[in-house]
Amino acid sequence: METKEQERNWHLVRNDNGEWISDKNVVFLTKQEARSLQIKARFSGKTLSLQHGYDGDLWCYKHEMDYINQKLIVMNNISLLEPGLLDAGHSLYQLLKGDLAPSWWTPLTKDHELYIEIRKKNVIDVYYYGGRMAEISYDRFSDGVVAKAHPKYLGYTDVKDENYYRRSVGKGGKEQFTPIYQDCQNWLESRVEELKENIRNIYSQSENGENTTEKFIQGKLITEGRDKYLDSEFAHRFHDQAKETIRIDMVKIENNHIIFEELKRIGDSRLLTYNGEPEILRQIRHYREFLQGNKDRLAAYYKVLYRIKKELGLPVPPVDDVDSLTVDPEPQLLIANTYKKDTEDRKKRIDDIERILSSANINYRIDNFV
């Protein structure tokens, strides 16, 4: 009986009145998050019942946080996705169709090691396992297609070379070097494999057993799941008056739902902490707020993106009726288990991660990736 009671206590928290509350109905907060939420509560006109845990932890009731966040969305505190970010009739897409397309374009679309993404303001990015091989855009002065690449992928890795990097001085007098992107059409024409090799050399540790990078895993998932994934690296500002940016790793389509999926490696420190709340909980909360406030706008955006990709002959998930696509406001978390050996500490880490994610009602799954 004592063991069962102890196990049960792991799923209960005590409020300031001494009452026991299920941890599924509460949200744990850092001191900074608590202060921020108190400010939001004042703006929204909602009283926040901030509670103090036995070990000094701060928490609030989930329904109070949900109300505050929803009220702030209504008040346009959450940045809204503006319309017109994509134009299916844009000159770039017209110039990449049929005989008008540069000779290097079609081979890129058929290269199974590459994946091609449509970006806001009608820019196209070409990726090779974590490296952005090329940025393709329309040049209105020449009325043509331009393709540029980071100089390091073209072999120019010396950041002090003023032909390829722009020097500036940042805070504290620290030197900064900004790459000057270079035309890479000749490389795309006849030196694609060399370009890939340069990227592999720069990311030599990308595929390295348990230390395989998140970007490599992401690229592998996309290139092997073209019937599921529609987009990657979606980014947008979170608040209109703040610099914080929402960045969600992958966007997929399942059962006519557009689903936003965050990717983490099992060893990522943001998944677990024994001193306060893991960062992943705050991250997922922000995703929820953003998706809830923008679900209709995101659906409209991705319907256009889907049609652009399909018209360009790029792989897209099968959809019977594009107009019926809807956005799932609940983000998903995919954890790549790169552990090759099981140890007691690793098993405990996984158990602790799952317990925290489950108690926070996060939709997650853990897949082996070795």
Report the location of each language-model feature:
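Charged, terminal alpha-helix-loop-beta segments
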Residues: 1-370
